[in-house]
């Protein structure tokens, strides 16, 4: 376990006594991203992929799974992995993808099956239950699109500038 913690510290991931890490080997965190103390990340039977230069405020929660609650005669804790499959697809465990350059405010919750498009902003306290395109500003419970960060013309310029800066490194 010490080796896991050392590897995390070197990547800018700071686990503390409240860092949930079930299935931590399913966590992918790209360069320039740090995960703050007090984070809760549960990778069930699906990965959590966090892109480059993602910024988190305090206490984010990311959960790639859910519980099946519709089986009669069973406690939720007794549901098997096989019972999470519907027509051959696990609909209760789905990846979370946070693309490059996203900023998540304090106390954000991101749930299974969500992709947050690159360079988006997630307002503090948001509960994200569906995917959003790049350059979105989202917030609320459940999170909704507030507006786009830039106009189409500004997005093209920004993409070009980001591409140029990536090549100059």
Enumerate the language-model features and the residues they cover:
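Hydrophobic transmembrane signal anchors and adjacent membrane-proximal interface regions, especially
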Residues: 3, 99-102, 122, 166
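C-terminal/domain-terminus segments
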Residues: 8, 31, 109-146, 150-158
């Amino acid at each position: 376990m010490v080796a896991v913690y050392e590897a995390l510290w070197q990547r800018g991931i700071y686990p503390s006594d409240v860092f949930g890490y079930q299935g931590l080997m399913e966590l992918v965190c790209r360069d320039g991203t740090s995960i703050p103390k007090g984070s809760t990340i549960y990778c069930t039977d699906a990965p959590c992929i966090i892109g480059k230069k993602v910024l988190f405020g305090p206490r984010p929660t990311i959960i790639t799974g859910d519980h099946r609650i519709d089986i009669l005669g069973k406690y939720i804790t007794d549901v098997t992995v096989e019972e999470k499959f519907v027509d051959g697809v696990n609909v209760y465990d789905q990846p979370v993808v946070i693309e490059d350059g996203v900023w998540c405010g304090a106390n954000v919750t991101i749930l299974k099956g969500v992709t947050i498009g690159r360079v988006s902003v997630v307002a503090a306290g948001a509960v994200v239950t569906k995917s959003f395109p790049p350059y979105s500003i989202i917030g609320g419970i459940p999170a909704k699109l507030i507006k786009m960060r830039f106009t189409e013309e500004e997005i093209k310029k920004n993409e070009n500038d980001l591409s140029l800066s990536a090549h100059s490194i």
